[in-house]
Structure formats: structure tokens, C-alpha cells
Amino acid sequence: MKYFPTLLASLLLFAPFTGSAAADWLLRSGKGTELLKDQKISGSVNLYLTGGDRKLFRPDPVKFNAESFDVTVTANGCDLKGWLFVADKDGVWFQSEKEFLLKDGKKTVLSVPLQAPGRNWLPSGHTESWSGRIRSAIYEYGITLCPADPDDSDTPYTLTAEDPVFPQKKADGTPLEIIDWQLPAEMTQNVMVESRFNLNREYFNPFDPDEIEVDFEIDDSKAEKRPVPVAKRFHVSDILPRVTKTLLPWEERPMAELELQYEKTLEKPEFQRYPAFYGQDFLRRMHFTEEITEAVGLPYWAFRYLPKHPGEVRLRLRVHDKTTGDILYSPFRTVTVKASDARGPVHVSHKNSMYFQFANGDFYYPVSMNIHANTDRRSESIFKWGMLPDRGTADYEDYLNACGKAGISMAEIWMASWTYAIEWDSARKGYGGNGRYSLANAWRMDRVMQLAQKNGIYVNLVLDSHGKLSSSSDQEWGDHPLNARGTFAKANDAILDDAEKFWSDFKAWVSNSKRNRYIAARWGADPHVFAIEYWSEVDLVKNGSGLYRRGWLQFWHGQAYLDIMPKLQAVTLHTTHVCGVGDSTHHYREICIDPPEFTHVVSDAYRSPGIHMADQLRRHTRVLSYGGKPMVVTEFGGTSGGSSQQMLKGDVHSALWGALFSGQGGTPALWWHDFVHKRDLYHHYAAFARYMEGLDLLSEKPVFGYRKTTLAGPRYQGFAHQLKPVDLSEDIIRRAAPAPSAFFHPFTYGDAIAHSWMTLGDSTYCAWLYRHEQTRVLPESLDELPLVTGQVIDFPVELRHGDYAVSVYDTFTGDVTHTQLIRHDGSIRKVALPPFRLDTALKIRRIMSK
């Protein structure tokens, strides 16, 4: 068999169809591409039609519903062999399994069935099987021809081709069926399980729940009752009047309908119900530095389930075919869940609402990294690395493996257009515009989640970033699949002529809801999803501040939460993010802090060069802690435009220790993750993680303190700067009034030693002592720093009487460098510290008698 696969199909933008006129067949051969005329041909050729202007192409229901692909051809000059072929917009090519013989001078009908998945069509240059996905996405199609007799390879011939025909299938009344439901009989508590199955029907858009809605239901008498969200909890009574009074002319949807959509009561099925999803397996290989993923086999249906307690549970499938109205329930199947010590999903702690815990009650203090992209163009420029290769998930594999070894336990991952967005511009390979999701990217996201789980890392999943709705800040609106003025607007089925309308247009809301349903179905049961972050820097979208003043951002976030929350099994943490330090977050408090449904506060902590990172974090705590929620910085590292490498190294080091001793709910996530990776700075994280071993900030609410003293000596004047210890206990925080004036501005007085500490109940004291200026900008060589000697601390007299172990830590290795025993009887006692050059950390813990 000899055939020539079609190359660069996506670049051919012919428009052969006009009204009822005959199609213009294109002839592709070794001589190039030309219109088929009466010319004589020799050798092998491809005779084909395109789907028209590529910028206008959308999946075609006519081809999806076609029974077969039929073409009538007449050859003159010699006998020919022929095969039909089809390809999608990305050049995924299929050729008919059947070989046709075209007799010289005779009209021949070439016909190949289209409806049988996995049959009649052979993949060419890839491993995907024939299915409805390809059938609906046929962009170009035609015939491959070559002389039947090798001796005729130079014999000239002519051929005539009639317009192709796609006869439509007829409804046969076959009942809806579930096929090959694979469900394990045993499961493990707090370990996610995937269950696959198929249906005997294919769907034009299997991602659209208005066409096909597939769910699974749980009959579990021991299950925790999920609260039904009530819209009024999201301040709807305050927001709706504000929105109603400020409607603009283009906000055409009646407010009554928006209010109805917002305040709708959830359907209350008899059993717990969660969405299933449509998926596809892929093969992955590296071609030099490029990651190549190829679909393999047939698509499938699946659901993911997280059993939360041991015992017996019954599960069943629910399939609602909305094209016919059929609703099918499978019989219940009983599975046994074995008890395990798996920790389960992350929650806000019920013991101390400023911190996190696992479902089993274990304390979780995330040591964080922001891996928003595998390659960052700003890093390449700032650090003068040159353009780095995009290695896809191979880069994430390297990052996450290194993070796991260093004790980093949380990574921020973006579903960005350059990483793992499942919906984007049809111009891009693998994407289908509005409502048609990238199965390849979903598979890649699965791989990232598997790598995270293997390395003990939890993922802060960011659904959207500001550039998607901006034409000025990291602008991507031009390529947004909803942009009706974009180049591929028709191909995307775009609906918005202005990015600002995203927040109030009902069709845009429905589109976002369907996408979030898929996200919830695929990753909402994964206990390694730390949280859902709805937006990164949402204030930077077009007219973000105006949308906030008018209440639309508040309104939209309320809708989004109410929509996605009931579809999530494991994920309990929700938040959104704005650009800027704590005062910016405070300014947008109605979406960042105040909503009770939003569980924690995220913010940036970029800084001016003269501000120490630890001081910046204390500032954040003072202005944001009034909400009584965990605080996590998800972007930091010098200024937002980058800084010197030594300043960034100072931030990497100081942020870890500064976060712990300022009451943050986890360590900040560095934006410049590739800087840590290429400079191999993971030892900072590993040392901190070792220090954190055995610490539990839940059992006793920590009380924090800070002071700074100038080193005495001929070059310095003695000076002491004392701050009143800050009590961050829950009760005090909840009574505190929010006030930006709570910020204080640190001052550096020569070579100062800063001392941050916390007490945990009456039996534990922790401290970090550091040279203030030298940890703000890390010296090139620590060995050049003179030793700090003679440092002592007062033994905390508030601790219970008894025997205590003092452990002093090297903050660069996590090693214990000095230990001593102290008997505390209530008298004032000094604890002498060994010399250090940059900083040191210690723990004083009561020795419990056996």
C-alpha cells in the first residue's frame, strides 16, 4: 500500500464551497498543489477538499451524523488503486482500511462507513483510533490514488471526481446502554479511584452537559452531609442592589434572570451525585527537547471517587441523553472500602483557623513554590539565560522531583494557555474553541498531578489568570475563545465583543460553568489538589477596579463558587487572588477576605529593595489577619520585575523563616521557581523542612514576638528597637478591626540582629535570630562575614517548670549543631547561643517524663 499523508493541512485556507456550486477538488502531488482540471497525471496523488477557510471552521454535525463517506470517481488511462482519507484541523490523518480498484474508463463509487468506532479507518502517523471525535472534526478529506500496476507508474491518466456525499444515518431505536463498566470491588480510604466505562452512543460534543450529562451517584449512609450553598451567605443582598443600579446598556440580560440563576436552589437528588468526564489516553515521548503527546486508542467515559471512610458503599451511574431525553441508571454496585492511614484532603483546621490540617487531623504547613510555567520568558531575560527549551511535562517532572526531595509540599500550577488550560483558541493545536476541550492538556494535567502525588506535593490549582481578559496587562484577550472580534472568532464560536462583558453575560457564565464542571469531574476528587484559586490577579482584567466597585466581581465569584462547590468531592479550599501586597488584598476584601465561603487569603509579597522579606511578611500578617483565615503568599521574589540574584537568594532564605515566625499559614511561593532550580537553591527548603519536623501549630495556638538590636562595636552605636509581641490567637484576630494603618515600616540601624520567636502553649519555644541587613541581600560568600558571638536569649519564664532540651539548627542544612539541657524552675535564666555568621534557629522543648 502506498499513500502520501497530507502535511500542513492547517495552513491551507481555501474556500471551495459557494452555494450549490460544485466543489473545487485540489490535486496534491510531487509537483505541488493545484486545482483538478483536465490535465494528465502520473504516479501517486492526493485528491482532496478542505473544510473551507480555516478561520471559519467548526466541527460539523453533518459529518458527525453521516453514515458513510461516499465519492464517485472515473479514471481514464490505466487502472488505479484508491483509498479515502480524512484529517482534522491539526492534521490527524485517517485512511480507509479498504482499498478500492478503479477500472480504466469505468465510474467507481468509493464508500466507507463512518459510524463504527475503531473500525474501517486506519490511523496514519499516529496511534488514535477512529471515533466520533474525528468524525465531528473532519476538516479535509479526499482520495489517495496510484496506478494499480507498478508498470504504469509513468503512464499518464486523467480522472474525474464528483462531489462527495455524506448520507445521514437514521435513528434505529437502539436503547441507551452502558458498556464495560470497570469498578474495583475494593478501595482504600482517602485514596482516589478512577472507574471507566463506555456508552453505546457517541455525541457530537461529549463535553456539553446540555447534550449528554453523565454522573455517578453514591449511596453512603456514613457520608458527611454536604451543606447546600445559600446565595445570601455570599452577601447577595448587598451586591445585587449595587449591580442593579449600575447596569450598562450592553448588559442586556434581565437582572431578574441573573438573580434567579444566582439564587437557584440546588437539585437535591436522593443520593450524592458528582459529574463524570470524557477522556482519552495518550502516549508521550521526547524528541530531543520537545515533548510529543499522541492520542492512543478510543476515548472513554470515567468518574473519579474519593472514599472517605471504611465500610461498604454503593455506586451507580446516571446517564442523561438530552438529545433524546433518555435517562439511564445502572444497577448499584457495592464496594468495600478498607481503612488506611492516608491523610486525605487539606482543610482549614478546626483547632486553629489560621492554619491547615489534613482530613485525618494531621497538621499541614505548606512549604510552597509557584510553578506557573515550565519556562518563564522574564527569567530568561532577567537572569540572561537565553531562551530555554519548552520540554512540557518533562520540565514539571524535574521541578516536582527536586521539590519533593527538598521537602517542598505545595506547588501552584496554572491552567494557563501556555500550560494546562483545557479551553482556548481553535488556532492552537489540540484546542477547539468555546466548549470543546483539549483532551491532550487534560492528560498532561493528570500527569502533573501524578508527579505531585509521587513527591508528596499538593497543588494550588489556578483556573484562570488576568491576561485572558486583558488587552494591556499580559494581554491574551485577542486569542480568547470567547472573543467575537478575534481572528478565529467563528471557529471558536465566540460570543463576547468585549472582555468586560465576561462577568455579566449569561452565555459566558454558562460556558464557564460547563468548563468548571469538567474540571471538577476530573480533578475535584483528587486529595492532592490543595485548593481552587479562581483567578490570579483578577483586578488586572479589563476595568477590574470598575467591575469591583460596581459589584460584578463579587457577584461572579459568588456564582462560580455556588456552581462548582457541589461538584467537588475532595477540594474544600477556595480563594481568589489580586495583584499587589497586603493593602491591595485588603482593598479587594469583598472577594479576597470577607466571603465566608472563601477559606484562606492569598496575596503577593513583592517588595521594594530596602524592605526585608521577613518585615514584609509581618506587615502582611498585621493587615490581613483580621479575617481569621490562613494567609499564604503565592507570589514573591524581589520586585515584580525581578531583582539582583543575591537579593533573590536573601528572599528565598528569609521568606521561609519569616513566614513561620509571622503567623503565615504556609511559606510564600516564589515566582522565580526556575531560579531556584537552575541555581540549585533547594537546600534552603530542605533545611527549613527538617526544622519543621515534629512542630504542630494546631495543638497550641502560637504567640509571636519580635525585636531587633544593633550589634555593639566600634562601627556601630548601640540601639535597641523593641516591638510589642503580637498575639495572633484566633480570638484576638477576630476582634481586631481591619485597618491599613496596621502596617509598620521597618528601619535598619547598622548591622542589626533581629530576633523572631513564638511560644506554643507552655512547653515549646521556637526562635530565629538573623543579621537583618545580610539576610535582606545575601552576601556572595558567607565565610567573609564575621562571626556573631555572645548572643543570649532569656529563657521564656512562661513555660511550665521542668526539664527542657535546647536544639540549635543550621538554617542552611537543617542539622542540629548544638544541644543542651536546662531545668526550668521559674527563675530568670539566660541561654547562650553558639556563634553564627548569618542566622540560626532553635527549639526549646519540654522533655516529657515517661
Enumerate the language-model features and the residues they cover.
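Extracellular ligand-binding interfaces
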Residues: G43-S129, A137, C146-Y157, V165
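Low-complexity, Pro/Ser/Thr- and charge-rich linker/hinge segments at domain boundaries
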Residues: K170-P184, F332-N360
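Ligand-binding face of N-terminal immunoglobulin V-set domains in extracellular IgSF glycoproteins
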Residues: Q189, Y274-V337
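Extracellular glycoside hydrolase catalytic/binding regions
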Residues: K514, W535-M692, V788-G790
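Aromatic sugar-binding surface patches on proteins
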Residues: K106-S124, D281-A302, S827
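Aromatic- and carboxylate-lined catalytic core of secreted/periplasmic carbohydrate-active enzymes
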Residues: R253, G628, T639-G641, V652-Q820, ...
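Active-site mouth of glycoside hydrolases
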Residues: Y300, H320-T323, S340-F598, R607-I611
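Short carbohydrate-recognition loop motifs
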Residues: L26-G51
